[in-house]
């Protein structure tokens, strides 16, 4: 993707791009790069350099937190057309916790340098508003995840995960039990046990490499 194509891609973010002067647009383009991440590749973590704001063109990013023991809890995903702003947490004074970002699929992003983004925030009120809006959206996602973990039973959390995958990708879900456990902040054995129960209830069919949702109505009754 050349610079002209990057500008055309960024123009879809009207709240951001639509309020920039020609000089500011040139500054943005000078401080962006097109990057492709492979499935499972770490994009951002506390140990890596501050990546910047990620505008997702293709694929999917997973944003998560991790305990000292290595237990992961997925906070949210960033899909095509969406923005990952917590990957620029080093220049966002309101963000005081470490997050990790991995690529789930072959993912294409336009990366806006974190420090250039901070400079834009200080000079353009619309960019500051865009930043605040993105943070509010992601904070809402984080609170939804915390609500599920704290107040929902595991069978309901698993049902929500399966239903969201059904809506997004259809009835065939190609995630391992370990991957689902990471998304839900649980153990693989717990996921396997609950999927086996769902299978006995006629909700899913579980095979070695995939899970098939066979009764959407029964699944929705678990939500």
Residues of each region from the PLM?
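Glycine- and acidic-residue-biased ligand/ion/polar-headgroup-sensing regions
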Residues: 51-64, 79-81
């Amino acid at each position: 993707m050349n610079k002209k194509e990057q500008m055309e891609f960024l123009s879809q973010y009207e709240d951001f791009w639509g309020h920039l002067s020609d000089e500011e647009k040139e500054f943005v383009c000078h401080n962006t790069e097109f990057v492709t991440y492979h499935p499972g590749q770490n994009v951002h973590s506390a140990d890596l350099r501050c990546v910047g704001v990620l505008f997702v063109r293709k694929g999917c990013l997973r944003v998560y937190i991790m305990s000292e023991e290595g237990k992961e809890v997925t906070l949210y995903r960033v899909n095509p057309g969406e923005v990952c702003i917590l990957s620029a947490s080093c220049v966002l004074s309101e963000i005081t916790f470490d997050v990790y970002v991995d690529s789930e699929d072959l993912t294409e992003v336009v990366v806006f340098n974190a420090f250039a983004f901070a400079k834009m925030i200080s000079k353009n009120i619309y960019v500051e508003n865009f930043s605040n809006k993105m943070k509010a959206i992601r904070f809402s996602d984080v609170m939804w995840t915390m609500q599920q973990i704290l107040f929902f039973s595991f069978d309901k959390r698993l049902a929500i995960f399966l239903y969201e995958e059904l809506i997004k990708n259809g009835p065939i879900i190609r995630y391992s039990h370990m991957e689902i456990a990471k998304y839900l902040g649980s153990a693989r054995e717990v996921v396997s046990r609950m999927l086996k129960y769902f299978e006995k209830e006629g909700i899913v069919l579980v095979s070695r490499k995939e899970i098939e949702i066979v009764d959407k109505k029964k699944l929705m009754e678990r939500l």
